[in-house]
């Protein structure tokens, strides 16, 4: 018996040594690739700088001062050429990149596309598309022919896409010119923005704090003035959290309002909770103009992806003068947000009431159960798909907690969850989230379907059009905090689980009064609350947004509500 135990121990040691040696060699090879990619980015930035410098400084600064509508109109009139617009935004994006490390690649082909559009515009029969020549930034995971989509994995560098995604193809048809790609967290399953290939992207308001994720590069670039309109993706808040952290506006549509054929996913094969593209901009009205044109021409996507229904832009909903019924909440029952986020919702409530809308309390049911269902449906294989990919790569330090959790067998997590629950109930609950077998997975899917019915039933009972709520649990925290507070996505992931359209609009900033309330009133009942409280200290001046959500195919009602809040806050 002892002999077999010794053999078992020796075998385990031998396996560990073999695994460690192989991984060390792998990391050494990947470090060379990562350094090469970073060197290539430096050269790429300099090429973009040379292109930008071809434009007269005064002209460049004037073009850069135009807002989205002004630039679009100047391009339509021919007062600004497409090449001038691209060179101006190469310059602006370089400045933003130097401040935040937001860009992973400048799409140098943008100049060629701009030249072609300018040549076509000279033809007497040519009709300019509605977004002719407007520069467009793209999250790095979106497929652009000839460019990488690594999702922060070193192993995927130098594997460029062979064709544009349907959406990118559509954006080009509308006249938009993709001019750069922006940074993401490794695997996309985090609300920070760091990876071993391109490093950490910082918040334009405070470099010690994160810009959010996973569309963090977009949030940082737009927040720093480097782009007028960009495209992110969102599977748990990846558009909305960066918008909230960086003082920008964006929306995650319901799943089928954009085509998915030929796209990619952070975790393929999760049918009930899937990512969708979503626009991000400095303000809501830019998002509206973008979607009005994209959804006005949605047949382009539907013809190429039969699973994308031809649901056109509904101007009657967006422009309706009928007063809305709005349900609101400032605490979801799972994670109490810090004072500034609650204040932002209450101020938005007053703005909507002043506009004549009815705003009543709404209580989302059973959020603790929802958090379990969300993580179970996203990590439907217990995290093994992402874990297997990470074990073949350099692992980003800010996601090591998730990696450690995925490496622990589910049955061990279940056993450990009971003693953990005695001192840290919420962590104990999340440790029971991952599925053990297909029976539990089927149960989870059934529970999600039942929850959707329950939620919309409550909305219909009160005849609600939209929901108003916090965008997150806190303002932008330091870069290491998202990995320590993985459950901080409850306010956004709920609407991925429901497949609602949901957007974020900036409303206010953290005040000294908010910080005093944080110190004196914010709970410290468990480790997550303690971390959140500490991370929020010193955040005075950081932007705060609110979230608006509505059932599928009612994104125009979401945008209308967001726009009314924006007008009340900014006066324009």
UniProtKB/Swiss-Prot annotation:
Keywords: Coiled coil, Hydrolase, Lipid degradation, Lipid metabolism, Phosphoprotein, Signal
Molecular function GO terms recorded: amidase activity; fatty acid amide hydrolase activity
Function: Catalyzes the hydrolysis of endogenous amidated lipids like anandamide (AEA or N-(5Z,8Z,11Z,14Z-eicosatetraenoyl)-ethanolamine) and eicosapentaneoyl ethanolamide (EPEA or (5Z,8Z,11Z,14Z,17Z-eicosapentaenoyl) ethanolamine), as well as other fatty amides, to their corresponding fatty acids, thereby regulating the signaling functions of these molecules. EPEA promotes dauer formation and may constitute a signal of high nutrient availability. Breakdown of EPEA may promote lifespan extension when nutrient availability is high.
Family, similarity comment: Belongs to the amidase family.
Residues noted as binding substrate in the record, renumbered to the chain: 214, 235-238
UniProt-listed Gene3D superfamilies: Amidase signature (AS) domain (3.90.1300.10)
Enzyme class name: hydrolase
Segment forming the signal sequence: 1-14
Coiled coil: 32-63
Protein name according to UniProt: Fatty acid amide hydrolase 1
Pfam family, one: Amidase
Enzyme Commission number, as recorded: 3.5.1.99
Protein's GO biological process: fatty acid catabolic process; positive regulation of axon regeneration
Reported tissue expression: Expressed in the pharynx, some pharyngeal neurons, the posterior intestine and anal depressor muscles.
Consequence of gene loss (knockout): Viable. Reduction (50 percent) in the frequency of motoneuron axon regeneration in young adults but not in L4 larvae.
